[in-house]
Amino acid sequence: MSIENLTLLELQKLEGNIPELDGFISRILAKTYDDFIDVLYKDIDTIIFTKEENPELYQLDKKEDRLTVEIMQQLRRMGYQASHDTKIGGHADLVVKKKEYIWIGEAKIHKDYEYLWQGFQQLNTRYSTGDCNQKDGGLLIYIFVQNTKSVMEKWQEYLSAKNLINYAYFFCRKRSLAFFSTHIHDSSGQVFTVRHMPIILHFSPKDKSAMRAKLEKKKG
């Protein structure tokens, strides 16, 4: 049977073997809220992995808006209705919509854990309602320091100590450095799930050419 005669469901099974499809069919077939969230996180991970390939490009311009706009642009190229700095209870960093479904992401460069907490609180108490059409959100954490695993573990411990109602966390099966947290949303009174996603942008090469470049920079 030729590819022209395959149904969307049949094509979806072939996505992993046909790079040109690039998850396109899964996005079309995502009818439920849970399907929308699952496919979105898969696509965000793909974008993150691509961004992590060249951390050296971000060392001189460490700006949250630039990093987040690039993610938004990639989501748009994938066909998502994505926007940056959208007015939803405030100026949300990243908003993705599909029909009545809304996913909101808050982005922070890791400076300290209180700074991440403020971003979490913006997502939790300012931007999201926690209603059934937006019961999930995300925290994008741009990490320029070393040892992302340690940063994420300490962030989870910090969050656990904040006495959120019915707080719980669990590790992400699809990405070991990410984790999910759940708690009772202040506004809706329902369970709100946040995916905490690190973006590894640490860059400190220690090969000979890198050391020479550092010496030359000091001399200059």
Predicted regions and their residues:
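Interdomain/boundary linker segments immediately adjacent to catalytic/signaling cores
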Residues: M1-D65
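Localized chelating/binding microdomains
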Residues: D38-T46, T50, L60, E64-T68, ...
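Short, mixed charged/polar active-site loops
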Residues: H91, I102, V191-T193
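Conserved catalytic cores of phosphodiester-cleaving nucleases, focusing on short active-site segments
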Residues: L94-V96, I102-I109
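Short strand-connecting beta-turns/loops that link adjacent beta-strands
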Residues: K99-E100, C132
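Catalytic cores of nucleic-acid endonucleases
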Residues: I109-N163
